[in-house]
Amino acid sequence: MKTSEWIDISQPLNNNIATWPGDTPFSYEVSWSKEESGSVNVGKLTMSIHTGTHIDAPFHFDNDGKKVLDLDVQVYVGPARIIDVSNLESIGKKELESFHLEGVERLLLRTSSHGKAEEFPEVIPHLRADIASFLSEKGIRLIGVDVPSVDPLDDKELAAHHQLFKHGIHILENVVLDHVADGDYELIALPLALTDADGSPVRAVIRPI
């Protein structure tokens, strides 16, 4: 593979994609066809912000937290490292201490725990709150996971969410990493310019560096 080739690590958005139980189902339809308009097809999109590959803003879990447009877009573009943390129920400082993370600003975790975008998982590996201070000490500003949340699916406290942003670490969820190797990449995962939103879908892509 040429180093200039970008690799998509996003979940494709279509009407079969799984959503959080009780959340807004994804729907795309052509609401105004070329035959009707005489010139173009116009589509209509209905979705939850937390469908597919997306970022969380602090407003998602804190009424006083920053919204998407307040976030530093520089965090979502730049060098990233992918590491494998498969076969773990949870991930914290202990599990990451053996990895060389000096100089890493963006870290993507491959758990390989759930690869079906059409089925919402029942259980996922989650991040423990102690990971936040550890990542911060390493200089990491973004953490990405290949599951819908950094916290357990049924958790209401969202300790990992809170601690990560408390330590200045941004959250990227539902990336697709099973088709890429461990190593260093350039990442682009820019959120939309949504003024008042608690998160945003992203088109996440990487290329080897």
UniProtKB/Swiss-Prot annotation:
| Residues binding Zn(2+) 2, per UniProt | D56, H161, E173
The cofactor(s) it depends on are:
Zn(2+)
Q: Where is the active site?
A: H60
EC number from the UniProt entry: 3.5.1.9
Annotated Zn(2+) 1 binding sites: H50, H54, D56, E173
Enzymatic class: hydrolase
**What are the protein's UniProt keywords?**
Hydrolase, Metal-binding, Tryptophan catabolism, Zinc
Reaction(s) catalysed (UniProt annotation): N-formyl-L-kynurenine + H2O = L-kynurenine + formate + H(+)
What biological-process GO terms show up in the record? anthranilate metabolic process; L-tryptophan catabolic process to kynurenine
User: Pfam families in the record, alphabetically?
Assistant: Cyclase
- Give the binding site residues for substrate: W20
- Sum up the protein's function in the record's words: Catalyzes the hydrolysis of N-formyl-L-kynurenine to L-kynurenine, the second step in the kynurenine pathway of tryptophan degradation.
Quaternary structure (record): Homodimer.
* Listed HAMAP family: KynB
This one is known as Kynurenine formamidase
Protein's organism: Bacillus cereus (strain ATCC 14579 / DSM 31 / CCUG 7414 / JCM 2152 / NBRC 15305 / NCIMB 9373 / NCTC 2599 / NRRL B-3711)
Gene giving rise to this polypeptide: kynB
